[in-house]
Swiss-Prot record:
It comes from Anaeromyxobacter sp. (strain Fw109-5). Transmembrane segments: none annotated. Keywords: Antioxidant, Disulfide bond, Oxidoreductase, Peroxidase, Redox-active center. This is Alkyl hydroperoxide reductase AhpD. Disulfide bonds join 132-135. It holds the Pfam family CMD.
Length: 185
C-alpha cells in the first residue's frame, strides 16, 4: 500500500468524500505525472500538515519525481513569503506600497529543477491555498502563457483544494481523538 493510500485510509469517516477525491485527483487528468505530484507536494507543504506532507513526498519520490518534489517544496516556501507580502499590498491598495521594491529573494523561480512553467504551476497551487488573489492571477497568467492549458490549471487547483481538505480532515480527526497519528512509513 502506498504512503498516500495509507493516509487516505486514516482519514476520519466524516471525510469520506475527501478520501475518494484524494484518490481521484491524483490520477490521470490534463497534468503530467510530474506536474500532478509537484502540485501535490506544494499543496501539502502549504497546508502544513506533517503526516500529509510526509506521505505525498514519499509517494512522489517513490515514483522517481525528485525534481518535481523539490520544486513543489520550493514553491510552497517561496509562496509562504510572497503570498503574505503581495496579499498585503493588494489588500491595502495604496500606490505607495505598490511602487516600493519587494527586496525579497526569489532566485529559485529562475532556476527550477523541472521547468519554469511547472514551478509557476506549483506556486499557483500554493497561492490558491494561501488565498493570495494577486498571486493566483499572476501565476495563472504565467502558466497559461507558458503553454500549460486551462484544463491543467483547473486540475492543479482541484488537487490543491483536495490536499487542503485532507489536511483539515486529518487535523480534525486528531483533535477529535478518533484516529491515531498517521505515519507515511
Amino acid at each position: 500500500m502506498s504512503p498516500v493510500d495509507r493516509l487516505r485510509e486514516a482519514l476520519p469517516d466524516a471525510a469520506r468524500d475527501v478520501r475518494l477525491n484524494l484518490q481521484a485527483v491524483l490520477q490521470g487528468g490534463a497534468l503530467t505525472e510530474g506536474q500532478r505530484w509537484g502540485v501535490a507536494v506544494a499543496s501539502a507543504a502549504a497546508a502544513r500538515q506533517p503526516a500529509l506532507l510526509s506521505a505525498v513526498l514519499a509517494e512522489a519520490r517513490s515514483r522517481g519525481l525528485d525534481s518535481a518534489a523539490e520544486d513543489g517544496l520550493a514553491a510552497a516556501a517561496l509562496m509562504a513569503m510572497n503570498n503574505v507580502y503581495y496579499r498585503f499590498r493588494h489588500m491595502v491598495g495604496k500606490p505607495g506600497y505598490t511602487e516600493m521594491p519587494a527586496r525579497l529573494r526569489m532566485g529559485r523561480l529562475a532556476q527550477p529543477a523541472t521547468s519554469r512553467a511547472d514551478l509557476e504551476l506549483f506556486s499557483l497551487a500554493a497561492s490558491a491555498i494561501n488565498g493570495c488573489e494577486a498571486c493566483v492571477r499572476t501565476h495563472e497568467d504565467v502558466v497559461v502563457k507558458g503553454g500549460i492549458g486551462e484544463e491543467a490549471v483547473h486540475d492543479a487547483v482541484r488537487i490543491a483544494a483536495v490536499i487542503h481538505a485532507a489536511a483539515v480532515a486529518l487535523e480534525a480527526g486528531e483533535v477529535a481523538g478518533g484516529h491515531e497519528a498517521v505515519s507515511a512509513a
